[in-house]
């Protein structure tokens, strides 16, 4: 009886540890407008400024607005439970 309880407890413990370790990371998406001087948004500059303000491999900058008249820089940060400050 004691051995079967110990065996069951060990199997359940190992199973629980494996399930917790394999659980996928929760992803969140955060987008913030970056204050920018007046003028046209340039994608390369927008991307660079976003990565300076919110460093990380998930940070991307996009120009937001009418196609060629985009005037705002939108920073998107997508990562495991990460929010821009």
From Swiss-Prot:
Its main location: secreted. It comes from the Eukaryota. Residues 1-24 form the signal peptide. It is found in: Secreted. Disulfide bonds join 30-78, 41-63, 46-73, 50-75. The keyword Signal applies. One of its GO terms (cellular component) is extracellular region. GO terms for biological process: defense response to fungus; killing of cells of another organism. Transmembrane segments: none annotated. Keywords: Antimicrobial, Disulfide bond, Fungicide, Plant defense, Secreted, Signal. The keyword Membrane does not apply. It holds the Pfam family SLR1-BP. Belongs to the DEFL family. PANTHER family: DEFENSIN-LIKE PROTEIN 144-RELATED. This is Putative defensin-like protein 142. It comes from Arabidopsis thaliana (Mouse-ear cress).
